[in-house]
Amino acid sequence: MYRLATRRVLAQTTQTFSKRTFSNQGFRAAKASKTNMYLGAGIALIPVIMSINYLNGNHIANEVDENKVEEGKKKAESTGKKEFVEKAEKEAIGKADVKTKVPAEEANPETRTETDKPSEESQKDEENSYEGAAYNPETGEINWDCPCLGGMAHGPCGEEFKEAFACFIYSESEPKGIECIKKFESMRNCFREHPEHYKEELYDDEEQEPLVDVNEKKGDASEQSAETIADDATKVVKEKAKAEDSNTK
């Protein structure tokens, strides 16, 4: 009896163990199949991943190359602009130098020859000639204090003398001084009114033909040449100067 019970227990235990073993083997097989499936999928994905990585690498490389190209372009443009600006500045400076270039003679006035400079002696001679004359053509002034006038500009008939003398000096008509005839006549009439001061001048007038009053015969007075009147005035001046020189001696 005990043997029969023992056999039943062994039989049940064997069945249970066999079931468990079979079930474990099935689980292991299923697990192995899943693992193999995952491995296959992973192996299949490797080319895809490599392709993606390759494309991404090329894209990154292309971006880097494009950045380098852009930087190179900008650098070239900036360098070209700088060179262009420098060239333009040099050309502008060169043009300015040409415009502002000073002739050698002006830059070095000392290099001029002595013949280009007016000699001091000639200047002194001109100054002395003007000092010895009553009229200075450069300034257009008359020196009424000049000794060559013999003091006639300051006598009783000084104003008449100044008018006649200035009229003749500044005359631009032909013959010279033709419009000054009346002024010279007025001067001579003044001389006659003051014989004590103008004896010599009146003596020269007496040697010549007596003058006709301008108011009485204008035609005769106008016929008298201006040169003759100028000569008379010159004689008066010279005689007056000689008289003063003799008195001072």
From Swiss-Prot:
Motif Cx9C motif 1 is found at 157-167
Keywords recorded for this protein, A-Z: Disulfide bond, Membrane, Mitochondrion, Mitochondrion inner membrane, Oxidoreductase, Protein transport, Redox-active center, Signal-anchor, Transit peptide, Translocation, Transmembrane, Transmembrane helix, Transport
Region (Disordered), start-end ranges: 95-136, 202-249
Q: Which InterPro entries match?
A: CHCH, CHCHD4
What are its cofactors? Cu(2+); Zn(2+)
Which residues does the entry place in the Mitochondrial intermembrane compartment? 56-249
Under Pfam families, the record lists:
CHCH (PF06747)
Q: Which biological process annotations from GO are given for this protein? A: protein import into mitochondrial intermembrane space
Q: Which residues cross the membrane?
A: 37-55
Q: How is the cofactor bound?
A: Cu(2+) or Zn(2+).
**Could you give a GO molecular-function term held by this entry?**
protein-disulfide reductase activity
Q: Which cysteines are joined by disulfide bonds?
A: C146-C148, C157-C190, C167-C180
Keyword Transport listed = yes
* Domain of life the protein comes from: Eukaryota
Q: How does it sit in the membrane?
A: Single-pass type II membrane protein
Where does the record place Basic and acidic residues bias? 95-127, 232-249
Domain CHCH, residue spans: 154-198
Spell out the GO cellular component terms annotated for this protein, sorted alphabetically and separated by semicolons.
Answer: mitochondrial inner membrane; mitochondrial intermembrane space
Describe, as the record does, how this protein assembles with itself and its partners: Monomer.
The role this protein plays is:
Required for the import and folding of small cysteine-containing proteins (small Tim) in the mitochondrial intermembrane space (IMS). Forms a redox cycle with ERV1 that involves a disulfide relay system. Precursor proteins to be imported into the IMS are translocated in their reduced form into the mitochondria. The oxidized form of MIA40 forms a transient intermolecular disulfide bridge with the reduced precursor protein, resulting in oxidation of the precursor protein that now contains an intramolecular disulfide bond and is able to undergo folding in the IMS.
Share the domain note from the entry: The CHCH domain contains a conserved twin Cys-X(9)-Cys motif which is required for import and stability of MIA40 in mitochondria.
Q: What is this protein called?
A: Mitochondrial intermembrane space import and assembly protein 40
Q: Which organism is it from?
A: Debaryomyces hansenii (strain ATCC 36239 / CBS 767 / BCRC 21394 / JCM 1990 / NBRC 0083 / IGC 2968) (Yeast)
